[in-house]
Swiss-Prot record:
Species of origin: Mus musculus (Mouse)
PROSITE patterns in alphabetical order: ZF_CCHC
Knocked-out gene: effects: Mice were born at the Mendelian ratio and do not show defects in development and immune cell differentiation. Mice are however more susceptible to DNA and RNA virus infection.
InterPro entries membership: ZCCHC3, Znf_CCHC, Znf_CCHC_sf
GO terms (BP aspect): activation of innate immune response; cellular response to exogenous dsRNA; defense response to virus; detection of virus; innate immune response; positive regulation of RIG-I signaling pathway; positive regulation of type I interferon production
Positions bearing Phosphotyrosine: 198
GO cellular component: cytoplasm
Protein name in the entry: Zinc finger CCHC domain-containing protein 3
Record flagged with keyword Protein transport: no
Length: 400
C-alpha cells in the first residue's frame, strides 16, 4: 500500500542526513499505527527531537569504515555503532551487554537507598561495589607492596643510635646506587647479615649513605672489619666511613711481654675502665704469627671532666701491660699528668695500694688487687682471676 512518502524517502536516501539540534518539545502521544506509515527520515527526525543528539563522535577507524560503505547500510549513511547507544536496562529484549561498572554502581545506589539506616548493609554494599568495579589501567598495585594500615611500626634498635655514614668521594656522575652500597659493601665485603642492620638511608641525589645498626656490637663489628677490608678490596675505592655515632667508640690494642696472660683476665681489667663491645682477638703479622697483641672494640665512659681514658700502662699481677688507641692522651704513668712522662716525674707512687706519696716497700696500707680493684687481696688470691676459678672447679670436682 502506498504511503504517500515514497518520493520524499527516495530523495532523502540520496544524501546524508544530519541530526537536528535538540530542542525541548512537549511529548505528544502518537496514535497507534502512525509510526508504521512514517518514512525513514521522519523516524530519525522524531528521535532527534525526543532524545537530542545522542550520538558520540566516531573514532578515526569507525569513520574510515563508514566512508567506505558497509553492506546492508543505506547509501551515504554510516553503519550504526552499538557503542553509540545507551546500555540496555535489565530485561532488555535485545540483550545488549552492560558495563560492569555501571551495574556495580547501580546496585550500590539501590542498596544505599534501601538500607540507608542499616550500617552493616551499607558497608556490605560498598564492598560488593568495590569488588565488582574493575581497576583502572596503571593503578594496579601488588598487595604485598601496599603497606598495611594496622601494621605496628618496627622496633627501634634501642635508646641510642648506632650510626655510620658511608660517603662516596669520587665523581658525582659515577656515584654508585644504594643497592651497590648495601649488597657489595655492607653484606658481601663486610659480611653483615640483613638482620644486623636497622636502616640504610640515602637522600635522593646525595652521595652519603647513613647506616643504622641494631646494637653497639654490630657497629663495632662493622668498624673492625672495615679497617681490615678498606685497603684490601677495590670495592671500597673512593668510599670513606665518616660520622661515627659516638666519639667514645675506640679500637683498643693491648700488649704484654708475657704471652701467657689470660685473655679473660684482660677483659676483667678492661670492664673496670670501659665497656667492652667485643672479645679481644689476637693480632698476627703478614706471616700469620701472633705479635703478642690483642685488639678489641671498646666504648669509653664519661666522667666529671669528660671522657675517661684508659691508662697507657698497667699491671696484672706482676705483668706489665700497655694499651693504646686513637686519641689516647699521653700521660705520666706515676701521677697521670700530661705535662711530663714517668722518666722525669718526681712524684712517688705505691703500686701496692695505688696511692701517691710513698713507695711500695714502705706501704702500711691495705693492699689493693690490680685486677678487680678491691681491697684485701692481691692478684694471686683474686676470686675473679682465671687461675683461681679453674682451681676452685678442680677442687670441687675432686671433693665429690
Amino acid at each position: 500500500m502506498a504511503t504517500g512518502g515514497g518520493a520524499e524517502e527516495e530523495s532523502q536516501r540520496g544524501r546524508p542526513q544530519l541530526p537536528l539540534p535538540a530542542r525541548p518539545v512537549a511529548r505528544v502521544e502518537e496514535p497507534e499505527g502512525v509510526r508504521e506509515k512514517m518514512g525513514w527520515a521522519q523516524v530519525v527526525k522524531n528521535l532527534a527531537e525526543k532524545k537530542g543528539d545522542f550520538r558520540e563522535p566516531r573514532r578515526r577507524d569507525e569513520t574510515g569504515s563508514g566512508a567506505s560503505g558497509g553492506l546492508g547500510s543505506p547509501g551515504g549513511l554510516a553503519t550504526p555503532n552499538p557503542g553509540d547507544f545507551p546500555p540496555a536496562a535489565r530485561g532488555d529484549p535485545k540483550g545488549r551487554r552492560r558495563d560492569p561498572t555501571g551495574e556495580a554502581s547501580d546496585a550500590y545506589r539501590k542498596k544505599s537507598a534501601s538500607g540507608a539506616g542499616d550500617p552493616s548493609r551499607r558497608k556490605k554494599a560498598e564492598v560488593t561495589a568495590a569488588m565488582a568495579t574493575p581497576a583502572r589501567p596503571g593503578t594496579t598495585e601488588d598487595a604485598t607492596e601496599r603497606p598495611l594500615q594496622d601494621e605496628p611500626p618496627a622496633a627501634g634498635p634501642g635508646k641510642g643510635r648506632f650510626l655510620v655514614r658511608i660517603c662516596f668521594q669520587g665523581d658525582e656522575s659515577a656515584c654508585p646506587t644504594r643497592d651497590f652500597v648495601v649488597g657489595a659493601l655492607i653484606l658481601r665485603s663486610i659480611g653483615m647479615d640483613p638482620d644486623d642492620i636497622y636502616a640504610v638511608i640515602q637522600i635522593p641525589g646525595s652521595r652519603e649513605f647513613d647506616v643504622s645498626f641494631r646494637s653497639a656490637e654490630k657497629l663495632a663489628l662493622f668498624l673492625r672489619v672495615y679497617e681490615e677490608k678498606r685497603e684490601l678490596e677495590d670495592c671500597w675505592e673512593n668510599f670513606v666511613v665518616l660520622g661515627r655515632s659516638r666519639s667514645s667508640l675506640k679500637t683498643l690494642f693491648i700488649l704484654f711481654r708475657n704471652e701467657t696472660v689470660d685473655v679473660e683476665d684482660i677483659v676483667t681489667w678492661l670492664k673496670r675502665h670501659c665497656d667492652v663491645l667485643a672479645v679481644p682477638v689476637k693480632v698476627t703479622d703478614r706471616f700469620g704469627i701472633w705479635t703478642g697483641e690483642y685488639k678489641c672494640e671498646i666504648e669509653l665512659r664519661q666522667g666529671e671532666g669528660g671522657v675517661r681514658h684508659l691508662p697507657g700502662a698497667f699491671f696484672l699481677g706482676a705483668e706489665r701491660g700497655y694499651s693504646w688507641y686513637k686519641g689516647q692522651p699521653k700521660t705520666c704513668f706515676k701521677c697521670g699528668s700530661r705535662t711530663h712522662m714517668s722518666g722525669t716525674c718526681t712524684q712517688d707512687r705505691c703500686f701496692r695500694c695505688g696511692e701517691e706519696g710513698h713507695l711500695s716497700p714502705y706501704c702500711r696500707k691495705v693492699i689493693v688487687c690490680n685486677l678487680c680493684g678491691k681491697r684485701g687481696h692481691a692478684f694471686a688470691q683474686c676470686p675473679k682471676a682465671v687461675h683461681n676459678s679453674v682451681t676452685a672447679q678442680l677442687t670441687s670436682v675432686a671433693g665429690h
